[in-house]
Amino acid sequence: MTKYIFVTGGVVSSIGKGITAASLGRLLKNRGLSVTIQKFDPYINVDPGTMSPYQHGEVYVTDDGAETDLDLGHYERFIDINLNKYSNVTTGKVYSEVIKKERRGDYLGGTVQVIPHITNELKDRVFRAARMTNSDIIITEIGGTVGDIESLPFLEAIRQIKSDVGAENVLYIHTTLIPYIKAAGEMKTKPTQHSVKELRSLGIQPNIIVVRTEQPVSQEMKDKIALFCDIKASEVIESRDEETLYNVPLSLQKQKMDDIVLEHLQLEAPQAEMTDWKNLVHRVKNLSKKVRIGLVGKYVSLQDAYLSVAEALRHAGYDHDAEIEIDWIDSEKVTKENVAEIMKDVDGILVPGGFGDRAIEGKIAAIEYARVNKVPYFGICLGMQLATVEFARNVLGLEGAHSAEIEPETKHNIIDLLPEQKNIENMGGTLRLGLYPARIKQGTKAEAAYGTTLVEERHRHRYEFNNEYREQMEEAGMIVSATSPDGRLVEVVELADHPWFVACQYHPEFISRPNRPQSLFKDFVGAALNNK
């Protein structure tokens, strides 16, 4: 019988529900249990694909091409599993499906309501995950905060699941904040008490309360929370700010959270073997070198917009025993005149993915600086496209060369739409999305990084390199070092006369893991260390 764990949040959002869920998933997996994890988001968008990164952080892409919440990145990195489109459910998806069924006549003329139709659809998404994966445990994180009007159907659905499958097969974890009032020198449990009261008014009694805090939580405070929230003091789990996120599973294990979960769910499993994870955390906390990477983007004021890129850089750093210091460089403030001053202290330059025409010239200036001054450069998606534009302008001398996405009337459309994309009007879900193979050219830096000539990577883009310019580019020294297996689509370019200048059309950051860094990131950080 599959067991179900639901993680809710109270008091404030962005409290760490995703990290808690991912960390618990890691512990349970290391106890020999099969784990699947999913995120329910109460917003009405079908997915975050068309949302501004300022609104929602990065869009995380799964193997099957789903554009999902960034928490799925945490899940994949912590638990080391590959999720799919069923792992992220939104209000928009659920309502779309229910309306589609109503139009088909599936409800036999009945009045379609939030209860039971919306809640049944939500429950089906949970049970579908169990059917498709046959996992021992399904962990479902409910986005938002208890008390939000948008969350009510989700909370009602997970309340009903307890009746559907039995109390011994369901566990509720509530994550709350214990704020520290600096002026009073006190921590306050009242917000947690009120949040649990709100949750209980909706019919859900949490079995475990995870309290986020900056300061240690005393036993007296745990006893107080337990008394008012009707749980044992041992079921109040402290989650303090950590030096590294990857220490959270060890902190939860130390407080026996996984034991409490298994006892409640009436499961038996051996203790989690966490030696490798402990070694990883020890390594992360004791890095002996430092390397500075300039990350040039237009959303740098919200670092979550580049969360997976930053994590992949850190993973590569762990492998090189190096702490990654990221310079978050706003491309809107970079010009040809000031780029040398801005970049003078960086050991490597990375231009990540992005859309739209704002701040493009700042990125191109950074790429030119990296190429001319032999600074290691790594371009991802748009960072690859602009590398070819910069080369066309400044090496081939093609004046006004650009991407047709940015400048539709350009004479030299180095980057252009594929023919099959030209008549598409909708923005959502129409990109080249998900895992695709790429064939690597022998004797290139890309092959040196991967150690093989055939790889699979995740994509998220609409525009492609224009093959009309391929021969010109290669004759001038830009190597096309990877293509789609049929040779039609350019996947990686690099420079022959540069220590390390590699740019890829795909998003390699999505497959990086803390104990298994992605190959291009690993070699990029190595090149940056050599450039110190």
UniProtKB/Swiss-Prot annotation:
Family, per entry: Belongs to the CTP synthase family.
Protein's UniProt name: CTP synthase
The protein's enzyme class: ligase
Activation and inhibition: Allosterically activated by GTP, when glutamine is the substrate; GTP has no effect on the reaction when ammonia is the substrate. The allosteric effector GTP functions by stabilizing the protein conformation that binds the tetrahedral intermediate(s) formed during glutamine hydrolysis. Inhibited by the product CTP, via allosteric rather than competitive inhibition.
Residues that, per the record, bind Mg(2+): D71, E141
Positions with a binding annotation for UTP: S13, K188, T189, K190, P191, T192, Q193, K224
Binding partners and assembly: Homotetramer.
Annotated positions binding L-glutamine: Y54, G354, L382, G383, M384, Q385, E405, R462
Further comment: CTPSs have evolved a hybrid strategy for distinguishing between UTP and CTP. The overlapping regions of the product feedback inhibitory and substrate sites recognize a common feature in both compounds, the triphosphate moiety. To differentiate isosteric substrate and product pyrimidine rings, an additional pocket far from the expected kinase/ligase catalytic site, specifically recognizes the cytosine and ribose portions of the product inhibitor.
InterPro entries on file: Class_I_gatase-like, CTP_synthase, CTP_synthase_N, GATASE, GATase1_CTP_Synthase, P-loop_NTPase
Protein role: Catalyzes the ATP-dependent amination of UTP to CTP with either L-glutamine or ammonia as the source of nitrogen. Regulates intracellular CTP levels through interactions with the four ribonucleotide triphosphates.
Ranges for domain Glutamine amidotransferase type-1: 292-532
Example of a GO cellular component annotation carried by this entry: cytosol
The enzyme's E.C. designation: 6.3.4.2
Active site residues per record: C381, H507, E509
Binding residue positions for ATP: S14, I15, G16, K17, G18, I19, D71
Pfam families: CTP_synth_N (PF06418), GATase (PF00117)
Amidoligase domain: annotated span: 1-267
Pathway the protein acts in: Pyrimidine metabolism; CTP biosynthesis via de novo pathway; CTP from UDP: step 2/2
GO biological process: 'de novo' CTP biosynthetic process; pyrimidine nucleobase biosynthetic process
Highest taxon of the lineage: Bacteria
Listed GO MF terms: ATP binding; CTP synthase activity; glutaminase activity; identical protein binding; metal ion binding
Keywords: ATP-binding, Glutamine amidotransferase, Ligase, Magnesium, Metal-binding, Nucleotide-binding, Pyrimidine biosynthesis
